[in-house]
A protein has these predicted regions:
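N-terminal leader/linker segments that precede catalytic domains of diphosphate-processing enzymes
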Residues: 2-428
Length: 428
């Protein structure tokens, strides 16, 4: 493979919208920027949660007048028996404004607090030991899980801390609290973790929920206090790893959010009902429960913006019409494979550029994660690229994805060949 170099002066926003993975890492780029648990020199660590809720067959999609998404309202029918929780970011957001995303956010020192270990031990010694054993049973994960942290943040494994972060942020942004009573040990018997664990959500009075959401948003340590007060514990048992995305290096230092980068763990939690949820009117301004096919139909017809990782990941979900199949697949996959870090790399061609992901034969062995090297280029036209480099996991500038190979982490290949069912076609 012959690479030449192209100056970093094209396409100021394409990398803002895409990400890719890699298996080999240069340790020297992970120096700390401060003593905070999840802050590095070039990016911050974060967690997000795919909350997948089982519905009855062919439940229509819709939103009621108050902004609370409920089953049984609307007209469009889905081929899927589940919906995902999606939140629209505020136009004032410094990162990806006005875009629909999964709930989530930046990890805080409180997520790594030793108080959590005490709380989980209170839940049960044997359950805690099995949990900690399960979290790393598939081996070492990508850097955000496996790197060594400052001693004050080593009380609990990163795998546990980022799950707590995902649950905390989901509660702050949507009011959905994935937790279980301190007395509830159901589904955590000798079969755990061989069988998928369904998530549990804690119902709360709106006034109580709103008060705690505000308190936790102002001070993440309040999340621990809330759990103690309500006698609940974050249901980390039901969260399985889904993927890991690192925001790419932008080609311009200008623009809203251009310098903001995040190494984000994506988790999945499957629940057997649609929990009541409401956006926070701060970071998020709209909320909806929506099936994957309906979401992509809306996106393709310009009815809403999606963050690029969401576009890629939701296309994976298209393989699973039944939530039971999705749950079993990802649970078994997570038992045997750790996620890989998806970090997008731009490759220049003679007449354009593509963004390549892990598994693509154009993906470099040592990608430049901090933007010190010129953009890689290949002497080939876009038209000839699939012929010369047929193992593809890439995106063309126009937004089209060419994917026929996996990243080697046990995940399914996104179904970009999917077409809209007749019931979801736009009405002319």
């Amino acid at each position: 493979m012959v690479y030449c170099f192209l100056k970093r002066n094209i396409l100021t926003s394409i990398l803002y919208t895409n990400c890719v993975n890699n298996e080999r890492f240069k340790i020297q780029i992970y120096h700390h920027f401060s003593t905070m648990a999840a802050v590095l020199k070039h990016w911050r660590e974060a967690a997000t949660l795919l909350v997948v809720a089982k519905t009855s067959k062919l439940i229509p999609n819709g939103v009621n007048g108050g902004g609370l998404q409920l089953a049984g309202t609307g007209s469009e029918q889905s081929q899927y028996n589940y919906k995902m929780l999606m939140l629209k970011r505020s136009t004032k957001s410094k990162f990806m404004p006005n875009v629909y995303v999964f709930p989530g956010g930046i990890a805080e020192d409180a997520d790594f607090s030793a108080e959590w270990l005490d709380l989980y031990k209170k839940f049960g010694e044997s359950e805690s030991k099995e949990l900690l054993k399960y979290l790393t049973s598939a081996g070492a994960g990508p850097p955000m899980f496996s790197r060594t942290r400052d001693q004050e943040f080593q009380h609990i494994p990163s795998e546990l801390a980022f799950r707590i972060c995902a649950i905390r942020e989901t509660f702050e942004e949507s009011g959905v609290l994935i937790a279980r009573s301190i007395e509830d040990k159901s589904h955590l018997n000798s079969d755990y973790p061989r069988k998928p664990v369904w998530g549990t959500s804690v119902p709360m009075e709106t006034q109580v929920s709103d008060e705690w959401r505000k308190r936790v948003d102002k001070n993440p340590l309040e999340f621990i206090k809330m759990c103690r007060t309500l006698n609940v514990i974050p249901d980390v048992w039901s969260l399985s790893e889904w993927t890991n995305w690192l925001t790419p290096v932008t080609l311009s230092s200008t623009g809203k959010g251009a310098r903001r980068r995040y190494d984000t763990a994506f988790f999945m939690c499957v629940v057997d009902h649609l929990p009541e949820a409401m956006h926070d009117n701060n970071e998020t301004v709209h909320l909806k429960w929506i099936a994957p096919d309906t979401l992509l139909s809306e996106y393709s017809h310009s009815k809403g913006l999606l963050a690029p990782p969401q576009v890629y990941e939701v296309h994976r979900l298209l393989h699973f019409q039944l939530v039971e199949d999705l749950h079993r697949f990802n649970w078994d996959r997570a038992l045997n494979h750790r996620v890989r870090q998806y970090f997008p790399v731009v490759v220049g061609c003679e007449d354009g550029i593509v963004v390549v992901y892990p598994g693509d034969e154009l993906y470099p062995e040592e990608p430049d994660r901090i933007g010190e090297s010129p953009i890689l280029t290949v002497k080939c036209s876009l038209e000839d690229l699939p012929k010369r480099y047929p193992s593809m996991n890439r995106m063309v500038v126009a937004g089209h994805h060419w994917v026929n190979t996996s990243a080697g982490d046990g995940q399914v290949i996104p179904d970009f060949e999917w077409t809209f069912p007749e019931s979801l076609q736009p009405k002319l």
